[in-house]
Amino acid sequence: MSDRLTLLRPDDWHIHLRDGAVLPHTVGDVARTFARAIIMPNLVPPVRTANEAGAYRERILAARPAGSRFEPLMVLYLTDNISPEDIRAAKASGFVYAAKLYPAGATTNSDSGVTSIDNIFPAIEAMAEVGMPLLVHGEVTRSEIDVFDREKRFIDEHMRRVVERFPTLKVVFEHITTSDAAQFVTEAPANVGATITAQHLLYNRNHMLVGGIRPHFYCLPILKRNTHQVALLDAATSGNPKFFLGTDSAPHARHAKEAACGCAGCYTAYAAIEMYAEAFEQRNALDKLEGFASLHGPAFYGLPANTDTITLVREEWTAPESLPFGEQTVVPLRAGEKLRWRLLEKNA
C-alpha cells in the first residue's frame, strides 16, 4: 500500500465561511486544500440577492492568503419572497452558481428560510429555465417529527415531488445522512446529486452520545445510527458520480458549542481531505477518492475539473486543540486526536 496519494485538486461543494473578522481564518483553511467552494448564504442577514452575493464574494476574496487563487462560488438564500427576476439576475451575475433551500428553522440562521416549498415554485421554475442548481437542506422541521426521522420524512413529503415537478432542474441533496437519502439519489434521474460530509462517513450517533455528550460532534442533520453510516460509505466509495464532496464545515466559537444549548456544526475545513482519506482507506477505496473529491462535483455543475494536484502522505500528526476564530477560538473536529494522513505542503 502506497504511503503517498496524489489527486487532482479537489473542490468543496458545501462550506460555511461565516463573515467579518473570522474570514481570514476560515478562508485560509479552505484555500489550503480546495480550489473552489460552494459558499453557504446563511449569514445574518442572509445573502438574498446578486448584489449581496457580490459584496460577500469580495469580502471572501479580500481574505484569501497571499498568492491564493481560491474561487468562491456564491449561492442565494431562498425565501418565501424571492422572485424569478432575482434568480435571473443572480444567474446573469456570473458568480452565483446555485440557490439554497433552507426549510425555516432547520439549522443555523435558517429563520428566514422557506415556510412552504410551494411558495418558491415560481423561483424554482426560473432556476430550471436558466440552469441554476437547487441546493436542499432536506429535513422537515415540524416539532412533532423526531430529529432522527426528519430527513426521511423530507424525502417522502417534498423531495420526490420537487424532482418530479421540475424534471430538468439540477438538485443537490446536501449533506445526506441516511440510507434512505442514498437510495433516493441513486435511483433518481441524473440531474439529482448529493454531497456527503467527512463526519457522516467517519462517525455515527454513538460517537456523539455514548460515554458522555460530545458537543463538537453535533451537527444538522444529526449523526444517525451505524447502518446509515455504512450506507453513506457505500455510496461515497461506489464511484457513482452522483455523490461528491461537501464538507459542511461550519465553525462556531468554543463558547457557542460547549454550552447548555450548543450550536450545530462541525469544523473540518482545516483537515477535510485528510479525514475523507481515512474514511476511504477504511473501505480500501482510496482509488475512488479522486472521483468523489475532484471529478464528480465539477461534472455535476458543468465546470472543468482542476488541473493542478495535491499530495497526501501517510504520516500521523496531532490535530490542534483549538484554532483562531476572530477574537475567539474554534474547537475543530478531531481536536487533539491523531490523523493518519497529512497534506503535503507545496514547499515541503
From Swiss-Prot:
One Gene Ontology biological process: 'de novo' UMP biosynthetic process
Pathway: Pyrimidine metabolism; UMP biosynthesis via de novo pathway; (S)-dihydroorotate from bicarbonate: step 3/3
Binding site for substrate: H16, L17, R18, N42, H137, L220, H252, A264
CDD domains per UniProt: DHOase
Record GO cellular component, one term: cytosol
Keywords: Hydrolase, Metal-binding, Pyrimidine biosynthesis, Zinc
Binding site for Zn(2+) 2: K100, H137, H175
An example molecular function term from Gene Ontology annotations: zinc ion binding
Needed cofactors: Zn(2+)
Entry note: cofactor: Binds 2 Zn(2+) ions per subunit.
Catalytic activity: (S)-dihydroorotate + H2O = N-carbamoyl-L-aspartate + H(+)
Record-listed Zn(2+) 1 binding positions: H14, H16, K100, D248
SUPFAM superfamilies, per database record: Metallo-dependent hydrolases (SSF51556)
EC number(s) stated in the UniProt entry for this protein: 3.5.2.3
Modified residues (N6-carboxylysine): K100
The family this protein is said to belong to: Belongs to the metallo-dependent hydrolases superfamily. DHOase family. Class II DHOase subfamily.
Role, per record: Catalyzes the reversible cyclization of carbamoyl aspartate to dihydroorotate.
NCBIfam families: pyrC_dimer
Oligomeric and partner information: Homodimer.
Protein name listed in UniProt: Dihydroorotase
Recorded name of the encoding gene: pyrC
